[in-house]
Amino acid sequence: MSFEDLGVSRWLSEALAAMKIHTPTAIQSGCIPKILSGHDCIGGAKTGSGKTIAFAAPMLTQWSEDPFGIFGLVLTPTRELALQIAEQFAALGASMNIKISVVVGGEDFVKQTLELQKKPHFVIATPGRLADHILNSGEETISGLRRIKYLVLDEADRLLSNSFGGDLERCFSVLPPSEKRQTCLFTATVTDAVRALKEKPPAQGKPPVFLHEVETVDQVAIPSTLSIKYVFVPSYVKEAYLNSILRLPQYEKSTAVIFVNRTTTAEVLRRTLRKLEFRVASLHSEMPQSERTNSVQRFKAGAARILIATDVASRGLDIPSVELVVNFDIPADPDDFIHRVGRTARAGRSGDAVTIIAEKDIDRIASIEERINKKMELLEEVTDDSVITDSLTATSVAKRESLMEMDKENFGEKRKINRKKRGLETEKIRVVKSKKEKSKKSLRQ
């Protein structure tokens, strides 16, 4: 079956062919015809299955028939995912002079305001930054959102969690009602909250919500080609054990993603491993967007062998050929563990995941093993004696120097200052907006 057989426009089918995409994947075959026929859609499929094209192809097909204003809005939880989705839309729509605006934190607010005022064809955004524009940038900026035809929630399970609730509500407040737009939710984890949306009665005059699942996290836990191992360590020497793991013969040349739970931990590890002469990059929410983008590009290009990341890198990001995943910290949610280790052993390739377990992590590990229905195996090559002999002293010195540098640079204070700056910028925008409204009122009088 071809994309044209699914109802995709010929120009778009040719664009896909130019990208060496000829045959629809299961999620694409299942969702594209239903979306084109007017159904709201819930699509569940694992990372790397082609979910973006599953919603982009029908949106672009229908947009090309009537390319007015802001046709579609895609909301996604992280800046990197927004940029990645925008790149795919731009590549697919290049021959049609498509205009796309990426609205994410860490980028120039005023520039984004001007872009939105020009009514691009598609807006790809994170909820927080779009909510800021809705609150502060005025009607001229957000008016185009009131007439969109499509709303997509990418990584919907994350977006529907409590952490995005207020921002999502504000975003929805300026969109057309559900009966006047199509809504598509795509995710690798079809949670109960997502699945419950299918049971809601459809809006008046609309067909029922369509649900299509293909190998979601609920259906496929861990690939058979993924080896999952652990080391049990005292919490105060985790970095030394990590150093030893990365120097094992089977891992010393592997591309690796190291997951941590906190941005401060990511920064400490980045500096420590760099002093130990590893080629590393980091990715976390406190970094400026330009640095985040540069880190991903360096890792993809092989300039950095190791990427240290918070969970912003656990979902959706197109990072091919990760050979090793290390959980330096244990996630609270077992599904986050599945997303993390899912960065490796993709498309039938083999991969390794090593989890560093400290004494406080036992309960979380039990929950993870129950969730994946599999016991982790001990990584026998890393022993207490080998760590003490080969890694402990050098790692301790490197970590101490890193902490001293961060203290000297007021790393924690900089984070507080940056947050205050963001708050001041928002307040300035409010003041400017208020003055404009007063000026308009006085002119009318």
Swiss-Prot record:
Its EC number is 3.6.4.13. Residues 32-208 form the Helicase ATP-binding domain. GO terms for biological process: endonucleolytic cleavage in 5'-ETS of tricistronic rRNA transcript (SSU-rRNA, 5.8S rRNA, LSU-rRNA); endonucleolytic cleavage in ITS1 to separate SSU-rRNA from 5.8S rRNA and LSU-rRNA from tricistronic rRNA transcript (SSU-rRNA, 5.8S rRNA, LSU-rRNA); endonucleolytic cleavage to generate mature 5'-end of SSU-rRNA from (SSU-rRNA, 5.8S rRNA, LSU-rRNA). Residues 408-445 are annotated as: Disordered. Disulfide bonds: none annotated. A motif (DEAD box) lies at residues 154-157. One of its GO terms (cellular component) is nucleolus. It is found in: Nucleus, Nucleolus. Residues 247-387 form the Helicase C-terminal domain. Residues 431-445 have a biased composition (Basic residues). ATP binds at A45, K46, T47, G48, S49, G50, K51, T52. Gene3D superfamilies: P-loop containing nucleotide triphosphate hydrolases. Belongs to the DEAD box helicase family. DDX49/DBP8 subfamily. The Q motif is unique to and characteristic of the DEAD box family of RNA helicases and controls ATP binding and hydrolysis. This is ATP-dependent RNA helicase DBP8. It comes from Scheffersomyces stipitis (strain ATCC 58785 / CBS 6054 / NBRC 10063 / NRRL Y-11545) (Yeast). The lineage of its organism: Eukaryota, Fungi, Dikarya, Ascomycota, Saccharomycotina. The gene is DBP8.
